[in-house]
Amino acid sequence: PYRRQRQMCIRDSNLPGLVIDIYAKTAVMQAHSAGMHVDRMVIAEALSEVMGDKIENIYYKSETTLPFKADLFPENGFLKGGSSDNIAQEYGLKFHVDWLKGQKTGFFVDQRENRSLLERYAKDRSVLNMFCYTGGFSFYAMRGGAKLVHSVDSSSKAIDLTNKNVELNFPGDPRHEAYAEDAFKYLDRMGDQYDLIVLDPPAFAKHKDALRNALQGYRKLNAKAFEKIKPGGILFTFSCSQVVTKDNFRTAVFTAAAMSGRSVRILHQLTQPADHPVNIYHPEGEYLKGLVLYVE
């Protein structure tokens, strides 16, 4: 199934290993299995038939996602069209989507409902968006009435993209500042000026052998946030690691809260949206876990 939006995502458990995200009139297709790669042109033709004139371009991006043992050596490139127009909309906000060189298909569509939720909590708050990438959470916070928003990412390219997106949505707005800096170093040096913090790191573990270190990383990261956030603050914290279960993540976060000595209450338990369906026989498909926490 697919969901019609200006920015949308097609992920069907009956087509394992296939991801299609649609940004305005461009579909970005990604194969994670050899079978999907082999049938990429058939899939592109079927997508064109179903979507009609709603899409004009299909970009194939699988150089880094196919199994190495398959020895397929795919090349990224357009299967249809070739437009360089990369601006998409999400709930009224505009974003430059870097599907050529960006992470995944260029944007994290799986967080859109969680970004929208954050907007409701942002009014008059000082917001820190860690691992900001394109700045998605930051702009929802700004639209929600945040007093100030700081976006942090270790990648200078991500910060450049965030700043471009600021100019698309809030040109010249003095409330926003962006920093290219390691997350842990930033948390170490920052004061207690924030009362809403977003922790949305990249996957800390992509295989089970890395699980133990990943959980240590989540504990350390969240403990820093609990230590620094203002009393009465709101923490949005996430894990997108498939091998980290919901219980694993909750235990890591709750342990971090205990380590910090802060009293914490759960406001929301978050996951991916309906167009990222989870097959009940493949629970690992529920890769996105999130908590919204009130920190006393």
Where on the chain are the PLM-derived regions?
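Conserved SAM-binding loop of SAM-dependent methyltransferases across substrates and taxa
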Residues: 134-146
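S-adenosyl-L-methionine
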Residues: 157-198
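Non-catalytic substrate-recognition/targeting regions of SAM-dependent transferases
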Residues: 11-21, 37-108, 116
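Mobile active-site "lid"/loop adjacent to the S-adenosyl-L-methionine
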Residues: 194-224
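Single conserved hydrophobic/aromatic residue that forms the stacking wall/gate
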Residues: 1-10
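C-terminal catalytic and target-recognition region of SAM-dependent MTase-like enzymes
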Residues: 234-296
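Conserved SAM-binding motif I beta-strand of class I
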Residues: 148-153
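Conserved class I S-adenosyl-L-methionine
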Residues: 124-133
